[in-house]
Curated annotation (Swiss-Prot):
Pfam families: Zn_ribbon_10. The modification Phosphoserine is found at residues 114, 153, 177, 182, 194, 217, 227, 321, 353, 384, 414. Changing residue 231 to D: Inhibits phosphorylation and degradation in mitosis but does not prevent homodimerization and three-way ER tubular junction formations. Keywords: Coiled coil, Developmental protein, Disease variant, Endoplasmic reticulum, Epilepsy, Intellectual disability, Lipoprotein, Membrane, Metal-binding, Myristate, Phosphoprotein, Transmembrane, Transmembrane helix, Zinc, Zinc-finger. Residues 2-45, 99-428 are cytoplasmic. This is Endoplasmic reticulum junction formation protein lunapark. It is a multi-pass membrane protein. The chain crosses the membrane at residues 46-66, 78-98.
Length: 428
């Protein structure tokens, strides 16, 4: 009957074996921690109680039981010299006992871990994909660690601030493999691809998790629909961007820095932060006077943030020639001149203006390298412009000279004849 029942008794499955091994491993790990705590506790109590007892006995013997003879005192102090050695030997024995227990525990723990590793290798070779994936996720310590480390990063990427989304997305894009697997190749048994939710980690040796990146991109992209510029899909492939527009002041500043900032009137409290309009990242700080007129490129998303205001520009001053002004003032102060002198002065003025224009054109040719045709055109235009007011001035001077001559020359009737006046006097 026993043989029949033994035949009907089913063999434990790999999951049950792994569960029993896992329980034993947990028990051994707990025992190891407990053994270490007991070792520290026993050694600490031994040192504490022995030191208190040693001091107390020394005090009592010194006050009441100390003999007068030297030999008796020496015999009395010998136990006090031997007591620390005894306590030290007891401490070493306790440490040796607990260390032996810890070694036996570690050996058993290593054996169980090696058994579990062998069973997991057999599972990866023999079991189907789905069962192998479940067993590895449940009993493989590497997959457990990956699963424990993954949800905080995924949750942080989902609930992150707008300034951190691009950095996490670029990190996820860099982790993607450049060559996807071909559809003709069947999935090997030890390289499973996780069909489950995106948060579950894949088996060890499998391809990188592609399901996390679309979820992140789908959660991140709608936030930037209303932003001034749409995000670029291959942003993680950009080279490192330009330096920040303004240096970031250190957070920890000494007393001397604070005093200098107070005297100069500079510091973080007197500056404005440069925040990117697209990814809301911090790009340094700018002075109050420059904040409205500064344009910068983000160091994280490379978005060009335009200036809030355009800097006002002063009106352009008119061109002024000191020599021409002296000539005009001199001609106005002298007054009207004869027509010949006016013409000569005008000719001199035209020659001087032409020479001055030629010199200016030569200097401009050396500085700006203007072609020869443009220089001649400019000289002709300036000469024509200078001749027009000079012709007007000539006509005005001629009219004024004619009027003066008419006023100074008397009429023929009004001129007295000296001969007639003399004859009239003699006749009288």
């Amino acid at each position: 009957m026993g043989g029949l029942f033994s035949r009907w008794r089913t063999k434990p499955s790999t999951v049950e074996v792994l569960e029993s091994i896992d329980k034993e491993i947990q028990a051994l790990e707990e025992f190891r921690e407990k053994n270490q705590r007991l070792q520290k506790l026993w050694v600490g109590r031994l040192i504490l109680y022995s030191s208190v007892l040693y001091l107390f006995t020394c005090l009592i013997v010194y006050l009441w039981y100390l003999p007068d003879e030297f030999t008796a005192r020496l015999a009395m102090t010998l136990p006090f010299f031997a007591f620390p050695l005894i306590i030290w030997s007891i401490r070493t024995v306790i440490i040796f006992f607990f260390s032996k227990r810890t070694e036996r525990n570690n050996e058993a723990l290593d054996d169980l871990k090696s058994q579990r590793k062998k069973i997991l290798e057999e599972v990866m070779e023999k079991e189907t994909y789905k069962t192998a994936k479940l067993i590895l996720e449940r009993f493989d310590p590497d997959s457990k660690k990956a699963k424990e480390c993954e949800p905080p990063s995924a949750g942080a990427a989902v609930t992150a601030r707008p300034g951190q989304e691009i950095r996490q997305r670029t990190a996820a894009q860099r982790n993607l493999s450049p060559t996807p697997a071909s559809p003709n190749q069947g999935p090997p048994p030890q390289v499973p691809v996780s069909p489950g939710p995106p948060k579950d980690s894949s088996a060890p040796g499998g391809p990188p998790e592609r399901t996390v990146t679309p979820a992140l991109s789908s959660n991140v992209l709608p936030r930037h629909l209303g932003s001034p510029a749409t995000s670029v899909p291959g942003m993680g492939l950009h080279p490192p961007g330009p330096p920040l527009a303004r240096p970031i002041l250190p957070r920890e500043r000494g007393a001397l820095d604070r005093i200098v900032e107070y005297l100069v009137g500079d510091g973080p409290q007197n500056r404005y932060a440069l925040i990117c309009q697209q990814c809301f990242s911090h790009n340094g700080m700018a002075l109050k006077e420059e904040f409205e007129y500064i344009a910068f490129r983000c160091a994280y998303c490379f978005f060009l943030n335009p200036a809030r205001k355009t800097r006002p520009q002063a009106p352009r001053l008119p061109e002024f020639s000191f020599e021409k002004r002296q000539v005009v003032e001199g001609s106005s102060s002298v007054g009207p001149l004869p027509s010949g002198s006016v013409l000569s002065s005008d000719n001199q003025f035209n020659e001087e203006s032409l020479e001055h224009d030629v010199l200016d054109d030569n200097t401009e040719q050396t500085d700006d390298k203007i072609p020869a045709t443009e220089q001649t055109n400019q000289v002709i235009e300036k000469a024509s412009d200078s001749e027009e007011p000079e012709e007007k001035q000539e006509t005005e001077n001629e009219e004024a000279s004619v009027i003066e001559t008419n006023s100074t020359v008397p009429g023929a009737d009004s001129i007295p004849d000296p001969e007639l006046s003399g004859e009239s006097l003699t006749a009288e």
